[in-house]
Amino acid sequence: MDLLPPKPKYNPLRNESLSSLEEGASGSTPPEELPSPSASSLGPILPPLPGDDSPTTLCSFFPRMSNLRLANPAGGRPGSKGEPGRAADDGEGIVGAAMPDSGPLPLLQDMNKLSGGGGRRTRVEGGQLGGEEWTRHGSFVNKPTRGWLHPNDKVMGPGVSYLVRYMGCVEVLQSMRALDFNTRTQVTREAISLVCEAVPGAKGATRRRKPCSRPLSSILGRSNLKFAGMPITLTVSTSSLNLMAADCKQIIANHHMQSISFASGGDPDTAEYVAYVAKDPVNQRACHILECPEGLAQDVISTIGQAFELRFKQYLRNPPKLVTPHDRMAGFDGSAWDEEEEEPPDHQYYNDFPGKEPPLGGVVDMRLREGAAPGAARPTAPNAQTPSHLGATLPVGQPVGGDPEVRKQMPPPPPCPGRELFDDPSYVNVQNLDKARQAVGGAGPPNPAINGSAPRDLFDMKPFEDALRVPPPPQSVSMAEQLRGEPWFHGKLSRREAEALLQLNGDFLVRESTTTPGQYVLTGLQSGQPKHLLLVDPEGVVRTKDHRFESVSHLISYHMDNHLPIISAGSELCLQQPVERKL
C-alpha cells in the first residue's frame, strides 16, 4: 500500500492557514511551538516578504499577535478581501500608519489611545517583544518598510507642513468610542462623500454616492463649509494638527493630539482625501476633511502615524505617577483657566495627562515648581506630553521646541481670606469644583449648575483635572495703578457691558472682574464673536499658555506690537484696535 509522504514541518515563512487538502492528509496536530492566535481577533495572516527579517516589518509580528485584525487597503494584496486600510482591531492601542506597497490609503485608528496610553494592552502570545515599534505594553505602530518619512526631531519640534485643501467638516453626534471600527470607518468615508457633493470642484464629486444608511444618518449631523475649498498649510507635529490658511495665515483650527480620536483615508473613489475626527470649541466633535494633491494623502497619513508613535513613546518613557496633593497640578498649562465660556454646564477641558483620571483632594498649587511630579511632567511631545510644551498659542512659524528648565520655581500662594478665584460660574475652570470641595472637607454647598454637566466622553480623553479653590494672592497696588493709566482699561465692567463696546473685529478692552477682585479679563471681538480671556492664573501670574508676562500692560503691548494673535482652545483673538474708555 502506498503511503502518503510525511507532512512537512511547519515553516514560519508559510501562511499559517492550512489548506483543506493538507488538513485531510495530515491527521495530526501542528507542532507545539506553533503559535495559536485567537481566531476571533486575527484576520488573514500574510507571510513576511522573503529576505526581509527586519524587526520593523509588520508581517513578521503577526504570528505572535492576538487581539489584532488585519485587513488590506483597497485593491490590496491578492488573495484577501479585508476592509480597506484597516490595520488594528477596535479597542487596542495600535495605529496603522501608511504602508507604501499596500494600497492608496491605510488608516489610523484609535489614535487618542496612543496619545493617552489608554485602552487594553495588546496581548502577545509566544516569543518576546522586538523592534523599535514595540513598547513595553506590547503596542506598536507599524511604520512603512522604508521607514518614517521625516526625522523625529522635526516631527517633535516645528512639525511637518503639507499644502492641501480644507474641504470643511461634518458634525459627529456620537462618541467614536461607542462605535465599532467598521462604523467609524464608514463615518469618515460618508463625511468625505457628503463634502465632495457639497463643494464645487471636489475630486470625488462626480461619483454616484449611495444614499446614507440609517445608522450613519443618526451619527452625522450638519456640515460646516465655512472654509471649504481654501488652500491651507497642514502642520503635523506631536503637539497638534494645525490648519492655517495659505494666503492670509489665519488659523482655521488647531487640534491637539489628545482631542483627535480617529483618522482615515478615503475609499478608492476618494483616495486623495484624509479625514479625522476631533473635538474643538467651535465645531464640537466633527469630522474634518482634507483634499491632498495626487499621491500625497498617503504621506499625510504616514506622518500623522509617526507623530502619534513618537508621542506614545514619550508617554511611556515618562508615565504619570500617582500624584500627591502637593504636586497634583504640576505641568498645568493654563488651558482651562484662560477663557470664559457662556454655558458653564458644558465646559470642555483638555487634559495634558492622557489616560489619567483627575485625583481628588489637595488645595496646594505646586504646578510650576521644578522637580515636582517628575512623572507628571510632559515628556517630549509639545502640548501634551513634552518638556518643550508651549501649548497652542505659538505664533505662526515659531518653533515649538523648548526646555522645561525655563519654568521658574514658584512657591505656592499664601492663603488669603475673602473671595476665592473663579466664583463666577462663567469661568471655564469651575467644572468638578464641588468634587474638589467635598474631597477637601466639603467647603461650601454643592452647585448643581456647575456639577451637573453631561457625562464625559472618555474616548476623547479631555477631562481636565478637577479645579481647585485656590485663593488669589494679594494683587500689588502698582498693577492696579498701572492699569488705570492705560486707555484700554475700563475698570469693573460686566460681560454684557463690555461686549456692547465692541464694534469691529480686532476691537479689545481689559476690564476688572466684577466677582473676583484682582482678576482681569481681556474682552475682544473676533469673527463677529466676543471672546473673554482671563489674564491672571490661579497663582497670580499674568500669562498666556506659552508666555508669562510682567504685567497686563506687558501682555497687551507684546501681542499688539508683534501682531501676534492670542490662541486659546483652538480659536484666536487678534488685538488690533483698543477701545478707549470714556472720561
Swiss-Prot record:
Modified residues (Phosphoserine): 36, 139, 453
A cellular component term, taken from the record's GO annotations: cytosol
Residue ranges of the TM segments: none
Cellular compartments annotated: Cytoplasm; Cell junction, Focal adhesion
Chain positions found as N6-acetyllysine: 154
Gene3D superfamilies: Pleckstrin-homology domain (PH domain)/Phosphotyrosine-binding domain (PTB), SH2 domain
Positions of post-translational N-acetylmethionine modification: 1
PTM-bearing positions, type Phosphotyrosine: 349-350, 427
Domain PID: 156-339
InterPro entries: CEP152/SHC-Transforming (IPR051235), PH-like_dom_sf (IPR011993), PID_Shc-like (IPR006019), PTB/PI_dom (IPR006020), SH2 (IPR000980), SH2_dom_sf (IPR036860), SHC_SH2 (IPR035676)
Region (CH1): 340-487
Highest taxon, organism lineage: Eukaryota
Gene Ontology MF terms: ephrin receptor binding; epidermal growth factor binding; epidermal growth factor receptor binding; insulin receptor binding; insulin-like growth factor receptor binding; neurotrophin TRKA receptor binding; phospholipid binding; phosphotyrosine residue binding
Any GO BP: positive regulation of cell proliferation in bone marrow
Domain SH2: 488-579
Alphabetized Pfam families for the sequence: PID, SH2
Keyword annotations: Acetylation, Angiogenesis, Cell junction, Cytoplasm, Growth regulation, Host-virus interaction, Mitochondrion, Phosphoprotein, SH2 domain
Record's subunit section: Interacts with CPNE3; this interaction may mediate the binding of CPNE3 with ERBB2. Interacts with the NPXY motif of tyrosine-phosphorylated IGF1R and INSR in vitro via the PID domain. Once activated, binds to GRB2. Interacts with tyrosine-phosphorylated CD3T and DDR2. Interacts with the N-terminal region of SH2B2. Interacts with phosphorylated LRP1 and IRS4. Interacts with INPP5D/SHIP1 and INPPL1/SHIP2. Interacts with TRIM31. Interacts with PTPN6/SHP (tyrosine phosphorylated). Identified in a complex containing FGFR4, NCAM1, CDH2, PLCG1, FRS2, SRC, SHC1, GAP43 and CTT. (Microbial infection) Interacts with herpes simplex virus 1 UL46.
Job description of the protein: Signaling adapter that couples activated growth factor receptors to signaling pathways. Participates in a signaling cascade initiated by activated KIT and KITLG/SCF. Isoform p46Shc and isoform p52Shc, once phosphorylated, couple activated receptor tyrosine kinases to Ras via the recruitment of the GRB2/SOS complex and are implicated in the cytoplasmic propagation of mitogenic signals. Isoform p46Shc and isoform p52Shc may thus function as initiators of the Ras signaling cascade in various non-neuronal systems.
Domain writeup: In response to a variety of growth factors, isoform p46Shc and isoform p52Shc bind to phosphorylated Trk receptors through their phosphotyrosine binding (PID) and/or SH2 domains. The PID and SH2 domains bind to specific phosphorylated tyrosine residues in the Asn-Pro-Xaa-Tyr(P) motif of the Trk receptors. Isoform p46Shc and isoform p52Shc are in turn phosphorylated on three tyrosine residues within the extended proline-rich domain. These phosphotyrosines act as docking site for GRB2 and thereby are involved in Ras activation.
Protein name as annotated: SHC-transforming protein 1
Taxonomic path: Eukaryota, Metazoa, Chordata, Craniata, Vertebrata
Gene: SHC1
